[in-house]
Amino acid sequence: MLRWITAGESHGRALVALVDGMVAGVEVTSTEIADQLARRRLGYGRGARMAFERDAVTVLSGLRHGSTLGGPIAIEIGNTEWPKWEAVMAADPLDPAAAAELENSARNAPLTRPRPGHADYAGMLKYGFDDARPVLERASARETAARVAAGTVARAFLRQALGVEVLSHVVSIGASAPYDGPPPQPEDLPAIDASPVRAFDGQAEKSMIAEIEAAKKDGDTLGGVVEVVALGLPVGLGSFTSGENRLDSQLAAAVMGIQAIKGVEIGDGFETARRRGSRAHDEMYPGTDGVVRSTNRAGGLEGGMTNGQPLRVRAAMKPISTVPKALATVDLATGDEAVAIHQRSDVCAVPAAAVVVETMVALVLARVTLEKFGGDSLAETRRNIEAYQRSVADREAPAARARAIRG
């Protein structure tokens, strides 16, 4: 079973991603990982920290000459600002002189005014901290860099095993007019990445940028909606047999686990609830290569399984909780009214969030693909996939024959 985990703090020495269960023979390089990390750092409305964060990638294990070995893959992303934070975030106790010097450091000042909407308050109470630093260091969205590194391996596997491409675009930011056209294709990705807000439409881009500029002027932050599309998936990934095996439940859990994500929908999602059944589902017809559909309202999933249509997943990101126009809070050291702490942050991180949602979708799809087809090497997995696809084609053959007879 494919598993992944990350470790590290926002201002710590490094972030680490560990991927276990990947087959041997998948071609992936540290350059590809760095390229995906660079995509995560894109976006209009990002804060000054993006100029400081430099994602230095080191693959510690699991790859040899650009190919996976079948063992655990460990990836390190170094923090180039570590020398500034070494004393604050040191793993071991400091000597008395260093501790005395740190006592007067602004970086080490206790953070006792939790930010509404962040993990600060509940984390301090749950874990018994008198300072929000230990909470915000791990709760920070900086952790998603490690997920993107892990997801790069999953992307490579999906592309090489199935020919699957996973891409994303921003649907809306704040109150901007949402994009409601057809989903993008792989050839559209360079243009999307070239957009400052990762928009698939020029008018939508202008509306999003205007929203960001207005929020920046007002000292505020913005959220938005992103869409991920996965193309080339076979029929039958996931299962109807139990709730935890349904692919939509796995995708929803993975995407909701991303910092600041507050909602997930598959296909037309909540809009489907407003329709009658005759307008909510995707009717099937015999086609030249089997069953075809005229719509994809289900977003590629029916009964917890892929149905051969493009997978469409949308996620709603809330506005960043570190608001320059500081929100009211309570100082947990004194119990007095206060304004929330303000760390260096972005006005809008929705374009970056789209890349992270891509990552989590790719990881889940890689996991269910390996669960379905198994194998110790990429070549073995491919053979299993090809045998299954032949079987599916045979089952669909009557529909193709019916279409041919009709004409």
Swiss-Prot record:
Biased composition (Basic and acidic residues): 275-284
Binding site for FMN: R138, A139, S140, Q259, A260, G303, K318, P319, I320, S321, T322, R344
Cofactor binding mode and count: Reduced FMN (FMNH(2)).
Gene3D superfamilies linked to this entry: Chorismate synthase AroC
Annotated InterPro entries: Chorismate_synth, Chorismate_synth_AroC_sf, Chorismate_synthase_CS
EC number: 4.2.3.5
Alphabetically ordered keywords of this record: Amino-acid biosynthesis, Aromatic amino acid biosynthesis, FAD, Flavoprotein, FMN, Lyase, NADP
Pfam families: Chorismate_synt
Any one of the GO CC terms: cytosol
Biological processes per GO annotation: amino acid biosynthetic process; aromatic amino acid family biosynthetic process; chorismate biosynthetic process
Single GO MF descriptor: chorismate synthase activity
Catalysed reactions, as listed in the record: 5-O-(1-carboxyvinyl)-3-phosphoshikimate = chorismate + phosphate
Complex and partners: Homotetramer.
Function recorded in the entry: This reaction introduces a second double bond into the aromatic ring system.
UniProt similarity note: Belongs to the chorismate synthase family.
Name of the molecule in the record: Chorismate synthase
Organism: Mycobacterium marinum (strain ATCC BAA-535 / M)
